[in-house]
Amino acid sequence: MRRLQQSLRRRSARRCPFILIPHRLLTTSYASYKPAPQATLEIEDTNSPTFLLKTSPIQLPARATSDDSAIKAHFDLPHSIFGDMVGVRREHVKGLFHYDSLTQPESLMRLTDRTLIQASAIVQRIVVAPQDPTGRELRLVVKNLDRLSDILCGVIDMCELIRNVHPHQDWVNQSDRTHQILCSFMNELNATRGLYESLAKAIAHPFNDPLTTSELRVARIFLTDFERSGIHLPPSVRERFVKHSDALLFLGRSFLSSASSGPSTVPHIEIPDPHRLLTGLGRQFVDSLPRTGRNGQAVIEPGSWEAQMILRYAREGRARELVYVGGMRADKKRISVLEAMLKERAELASVLGKNNWAEVVLVDKMTKTPENVMRFLTSLAQHHQPVARAEVDMLRRMKATALTGNYFDPRNSRTRHLPLFHAWDRDYYSDKYLTSLIPTGSPPSISPYLSTGTVMSGLSRIFSRLYGISFKPAVVSPGEVWHPSVRRLDVVHEEEGLIGVIYCDFFSRIGKSSGAAHYTVRCSRRVDDDDIDGDGLPEDWDKPYGPGLEADKESLSGKPGKYQLPIIALSMDVGTVNEGRPALLNWQELETLFHEMGHAIHSMIGRTEYHNVSGTRCATDFVELPSILMEHFVSSPEVLSTLAFHHATGEPLPIPVIEAHLALNQSLSALETHGQIAMALLDQKYHTLRHGQDSFDSTAIWFQLQQEIGVIQPVPGTAWQMQFGHLYGYGATYYSYLFDRAIAGKIWSTLFHRSGTSQAYDRKAEGILSREGGELLKEKVLKWGGGRDPWEMVGDVIGGVEGDELSKGDERALALVGSWSVV
């Protein structure tokens, strides 16, 4: 699958919003092992004795450093080397994430009670702030709202991680309970008008010490979230808002559940004369299929593995047609749920005084309005449609050759006499085309060159060269991680020292989700000026509950005050580490790891003064930018040649193999990108529905869109939109990944892609991995998190007249982004 689809399928662990809106989601291949000389490697930790690892072969490239060795050992050696886990600190038991308050599942409820008491005190303080005659409390409203957000989200976000990755059900159950209680408390805050009024007064008040630019941005984000929740509405109107919000929550979950489950499994698909129609799949496959009692028709379950194999390998188009239509057939019940959800959103938008749901959602995004999104997507569609059509015509020529036995030159532009190309032809002829690119039928495996440790040490080198940031393997205390296979990395800047912690849950285990996700455990923020005494809680109020999630206060270079450092966790499923054989990544897993590391490094560098704009807490149509840039790095042959080394021999991945894999990965990309553009346009058309449009027909809209901009015509009787699950979680913002890909491509070519610097790959990599480019990206984009207008950040990076135009964030800026190619 292509990277657009891969990234959009990743499970997104979304940031905890302070204002919890009901419709808003909180949101491996193995190769044979060849023994090599034994290595002695060290894992260093400044706070504990050094462990010596005497183990089976670890081979590194000639230029590898001791840090490379330590990182490689950290991920490539089995955890049994240390008994229970890699790098266990021999001291008393700590709690999860080194918090003393999280030593057992039951401690979550004590933490919940403690959090509710502290949060309630801050809420009361904010509500009465306007009554302070000195104005001091009003001046602290933004700071205290941010503290409140940090206290609540710190627990909610952590529980989101625990309930998704912890292997023990007691922890999962308790985290579910805590999550539910605190989210319910947030819903109560939605109705606390005093919070909204105090914030509005603080924004408008003429303080002698005015709110800073950062404070104003944080304040306006809070204000927008409040108003999106209907807090400013009259009581009778707000009752309607709550009613429609509850209905929308139910409909959204119902739609998402059905979309996630795939096509309806009944009725089954029946294929007559299977030995003839299923030619190309092999007799063993055909004989294994269940049969009906009459005429021996093969029975296929829609959406099954067998159905996928038929779409990909069955030579007879009739078999593929039966399977395609059977998997996409219109289901009136599912369609009615989708359309009810969309109509409910339109009505909710009307309650909020907006024309449509897209207006509600986009008000705080880079694009600002649905009209701007449509202009961007229309521009992309116009650019990509001819290229995508050319790729379809190439597949049509392959179909003509297969049907007639006559050779049709793929380079011939004449299409008049070519056969029609149907939706059920795409997988089959795409696979034939990709196979034709490789003389041997399949590319050499790259997995032996991509052990988890090799890749992680390579990422550390990349970040060191770009930002002066590297990874240091860290020992963990008993109880600090949720499974023995979880590795901890301390993130260290060459001048500032420790700047954050990453927990890496990469390896397979029973019951673990196969998706990839970035979880925020703790955001950065300034903590030395919290004024906790002003909350009015009595001395020793927290003794019955034990400690909270207090963090050490750290000084940051060039910033006043002290900060709590960010903690994030990355979850993937890349196989297991065994004695003598590390977990090896395939190409898709490599891309995914780089993508997630883009989010991780954004969290580490974006150490802002305020929690609510820290790291990845930024606009939906901006947050993917750092991760997409990392995809550019991994797709660069120059960079990949410095990253991939055989796990057993230390030999570099041959350049021809790199080039073959990159060429294969980028083939038919215009067709896939155009499909994503069509999906984003459909999302906008659905969410610009106005309240009262009773004639709304989601299938007709999809068919009309395909007639306008599609390159493969839709099939009568099908309703693909039933399976478009992102319509719930990404309603009106599905364009975001395409938008960020356009911006990332421009930044990549501006800062990093220096063509013609040298014929040698390693010297070209020196140019791409330039400190100058990395520092510009860090200083102008990453360090701000969500604390600065993203248009200004992008404009600063691009520079010149074009950068000045972009900084305005107006229609001209959007037109510029729309003119950039999505690569």
Curated annotation (Swiss-Prot):
Q: Drop me one GO molecular function for this one.
A: metalloendopeptidase activity
| Chemical reaction(s) catalysed | Release of an N-terminal octapeptide as second stage of processing of some proteins imported into the mitochondrion
Q: Which top EC class applies here?
A: hydrolase
CDD domains cross-referenced by the UniProt entry = M3A_MIP (cd06457)
**EC number assigned by the record:** 3.4.24.59
Name its cellular compartments: Mitochondrion matrix
Which portion of the chain is the transit peptide?
Answer: 1-33
What protein does this entry describe? Answer: Mitochondrial intermediate peptidase 2
Protein source organism: Cryptococcus neoformans var. neoformans serotype D (strain JEC21 / ATCC MYA-565)
SUPFAM superfamilies (alphabetical): Metalloproteases ('zincins'), catalytic domain
Could you tell me which InterPro entries the record lists for this protein?
Answer: M3A_MIP, MetalloPept_cat_dom_sf, Neurolysin/TOP_dom2, Pept_M3A_M3B, Pept_M3A_M3B_dom
Q: What does this protein do?
A: Cleaves proteins, imported into the mitochondrion, to their mature size. While most mitochondrial precursor proteins are processed to the mature form in one step by mitochondrial processing peptidase (MPP), the sequential cleavage by MIP of an octapeptide after initial processing by MPP is a required step for a subgroup of nuclear-encoded precursor proteins destined for the matrix or the inner membrane.
Q: Where is the active site?
A: 596
**Keyword tags:** Hydrolase, Metal-binding, Metalloprotease, Mitochondrion, Protease, Transit peptide, Zinc
Give cofactor(s), names only.
Answer: Zn(2+)
Q: Where is this region: Disordered?
A: 532-553
Which GO terms are recorded in the biological process aspect for this UniProt protein?
A: peptide metabolic process; protein processing involved in protein targeting to mitochondrion
Cofactor binding, note field? Binds 1 zinc ion.
Q: Which family does it belong to?
A: Belongs to the peptidase M3 family.
Chain sites annotated for binding Zn(2+): 595, 599, 602
One Gene Ontology term, aspect cellular component: mitochondrion
Any single Pfam family the record assigns to this protein? Peptidase_M3
Quote the Gene3D superfamilies the UniProt record gives: Collagenase (Catalytic Domain), Neurolysin, domain 3
